[in-house]
């Protein structure tokens, strides 16, 4: 993740920006379990947070694609990790929006987007569990 974000700077004009939108890993369906073939697992929030050996056992028991969902688990990202990568790779945040209800849910479920409460967005680590989507606009950090 850090290597990719750092590499993207080579395509960025001096006044350019990069948009990122992602679900924090710890959100209820951060493991993309909604696409699982098991009706139970596809509706079970947070179970992707189980320790990897337990998670793989559950996937195997329910005849899911263990390798695919384990890879998703291994590449999940939190808000804090993303912000640390942004800082460490020489970018700065221009704008950020945290959502309690992801804008894509308009198309999936007919739900209107709902911004996350400021108090929740301000609490590191806790916000990951209750924020379904974040949007970030980043640019080069001035070094001089």
Identify what each model region corresponds to.
Residues 61-144:
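A C-terminal cap/extension of S-adenosyl-L-methionine-dependent methyltransferases
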Residues 17-50:
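Conserved class I S-adenosyl-L-methionine
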Residues 2-17:
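A short glycine-rich, Lys/Arg-flanked "PGG" loop and its adjoining helix->strand segment in the class I
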Residues 2-3, 31-34, 88:
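Short amphipathic alpha-helical segments
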Residues 43-64:
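A structural motif
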């Amino acid at each position: 993740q850090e290597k990719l974000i750092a590499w993207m700077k080579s395509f960025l004009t001096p006044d350019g920006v990069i948009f990122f939108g992602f679900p924090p890993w710890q959100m209820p369906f951060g493991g993309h379990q909604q696409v699982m073939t098991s009706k139970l697992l596809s509706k079970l929030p947070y179970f992707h947070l189980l320790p990897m050996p337990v998670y793989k056992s559950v996937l195997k028991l329910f005849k899911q694609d263990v390798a695919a969902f384990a890879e998703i688990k291994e590449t999940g990202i939190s808000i804090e990790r993303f912000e640390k990568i942004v800082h460490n790779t020489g970018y700065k945040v221009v704008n950020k929006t945290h959502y309690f209800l992801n804008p894509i849910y308009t198309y999936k479920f007919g739900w209107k987007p709902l911004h996350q409460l400021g108090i929740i967005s301000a609490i590191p680590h806790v916000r990951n569990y209750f924020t379904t989507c974040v949007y970030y606009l980043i640019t080069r950090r001035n070094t001089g």
